């Protein structure tokens, strides 16, 4: 099945059939490919090629660069079903999530095409007669993208489409757990490039490998920007290395996202939002809902409703109409069980969280989503666990709810369910949520392309995708032009 998908997507069989490193599907643990890992020497070669590609590509007008991305979006539309199914096989996502991720790629292509005609600078009034000032934006250089397993194709597209319309060349180092989807994306992109006369060779490249390959990309002084998605631990390694050589980084790291459930909330709507946000993608989104901060007046009722909903959710093969697929691997399962044991030791009451379908899928890790009622926001609650665990804590005072929302190291996404406009506005104010995303009456997951995506604190501070995130992929230049016959100095200085 996977081989047929890869064949239709145009991937050379030699790239996924003859390597020494096996690729296993989280669906059933079966081997779906074997890839050859590349290391520092191959990265060095790729960066050299990317430098040449950048030198040519930056000279191509931005709207023309956008045309390449437009054509890539059309190819993604044509192969959406196949690529979405491949995402399911390699990352364990249910059908709708696999298709949705490819749709994100299509959406960011559309956004980037429009952006290619809107890379606006500024005109600035000069204090000197016969002068004008302006601010312009120019291509940056070689961009390195390091992505995680949980969004194996969308995050690459967020970065690459913007990087391309901004005039850069891209090298992608995907997660070692999801190399096949990366090879497929590269094959689809190359279909477009080979018929696009202005596109130089090696405009986009993929490096398949482990930590050595990623480290080589991060350390190379010719790579102007590293955009890295992953754990906070990974970010702590990447950020100092990039900063030491005065390059740029866009970091999208951990999230420990909360929902404040106010006493006036629509509980029917809240249950639906919690279910999607807390158990979707088996709790393996960076924006997964991990903490429910519920007002004491509604806490018991919402927990009762959630337990009923959790008991009915369909768990199983992600391509067979179920709502929860597997965890990515045994390591993910072990981390979940360790967190639940710690929660019990800290006074929590655990509902769910056990392994499921072990007889049917002995080499895969399906679990029932867990609800954990906690007496307080303890250490385990403040730690991100990449699994479907929802911690529930109560509050009585709205100020306390805001404090709990912000009292974790991470700052990615957050939300409030309320019909009280004062609560909603305060939540979004300067004294409200300290996260990069703060939603009202919608969960923390499912961000749209048009808004910049990213968070604060240990989430890394980077922004990807929409709004003005494109500026991270360009260099700013301030210009002063003297069109007079004099040479006046700023601040009224005389130098005669």
List where the protein language model places each region.
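Rossmann-like NAD(P) dinucleotide-binding subdomain of oxidoreductase/dehydrogenase enzymes
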Residues: 121-269, 321, 395
């Amino acid at each position: 099945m996977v081989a047929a998908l890869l064949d239709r997507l145009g991937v050379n069989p030699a790239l996924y059939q003859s390597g020494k490193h096996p690729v296993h599907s989280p669906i059933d643990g079966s081997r779906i490919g074997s890839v050859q890992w590349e290391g520092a020497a191959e990265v060095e070669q790729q960066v050299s090629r990317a430098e040449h590609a950048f030198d040519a590509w930056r000279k191509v007008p931005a709207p023309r660069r956008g045309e390449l991305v437009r054509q890539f979006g059309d190819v993604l539309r044509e192969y959406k079903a196949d690529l979405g199914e491949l995402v399911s096989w390699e990352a364990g996502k249910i059908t709708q999530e696999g298709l949705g991720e490819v749709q994100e790629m299509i959406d960011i292509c559309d956004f980037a095409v429009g952006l290619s005609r809107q890379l606006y600078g500024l005109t600035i009034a000069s204090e000197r007669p016969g002068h004008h000032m302006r601010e312009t934006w120019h291509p940056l250089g070689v961009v390195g993208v390091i992505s995680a397993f949980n969004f194996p194709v969308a995050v690459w597209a967020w970065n690459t489409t913007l990087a391309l319309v901004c005039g850069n060349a891209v090298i992608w180092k995907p997660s070692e757990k999801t190399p096949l989807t990366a090879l497929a994306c590269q094959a689809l992109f190359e279909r477009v490039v080979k018929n696009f006369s202005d596109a130089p060779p090696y405009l986009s490249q993929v490096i398949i490998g482990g930590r050595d390959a990623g480290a080589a990309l991060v350390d190379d002084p010719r790579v102007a920007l590293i955009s890295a998605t992953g754990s906070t631990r990974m970010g702590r390694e990447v950020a100092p290395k990039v900063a030491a050589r005065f390059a740029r980084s866009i970091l999208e790291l951990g999230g420990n996202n909360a929902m404040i459930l106010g006493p006036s909330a629509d509980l029917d709507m809240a249950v639906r939002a919690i279910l999607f946000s807390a158990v979707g993608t088996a709790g393996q989104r960076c924006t997964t809902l991990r903490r429910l901060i519920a007002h004491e007046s509604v806490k018991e009722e919402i927990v009762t409703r959630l337990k009923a909903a959790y008991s009915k959710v369909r768990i199983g093969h992600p391509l067979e109409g179920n709502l929860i697929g597997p965890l990515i691997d045994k390591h993910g399962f072990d981390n979940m069980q360790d967190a639940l044991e710690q929660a019990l030791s800290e006074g929590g009451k655990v509902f769910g969280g056990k392994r499921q379908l072990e007889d049917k899928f002995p080499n895969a890790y399906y679990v029932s989503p867990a609800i954990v009622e906690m007496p307080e926001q303890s250490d385990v609650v403040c730690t991100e666990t990449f699994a479907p665990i929802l911690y529930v804590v109560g509050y009585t005072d709205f100020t306390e709810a805001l404090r709990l929302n912000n009292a974790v190291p991470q700052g990615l996404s957050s939300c409030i369910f309320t019909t009280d406009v004062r609560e909603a506005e305060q939540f979004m104010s300067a004294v409200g949520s300290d996260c990069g995303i703060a939603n009202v009456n919608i969960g923390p997951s499912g961000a749209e392309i048009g808004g910049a995506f990213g968070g604060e604190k240990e989430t890394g501070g980077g922004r990807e995708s929409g709004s003005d995130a494109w500026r991270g992929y360009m260099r700013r230049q301030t210009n002063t032009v003297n069109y007079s016959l004099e040479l006046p100095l700023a601040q009224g200085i005389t130098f005669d």
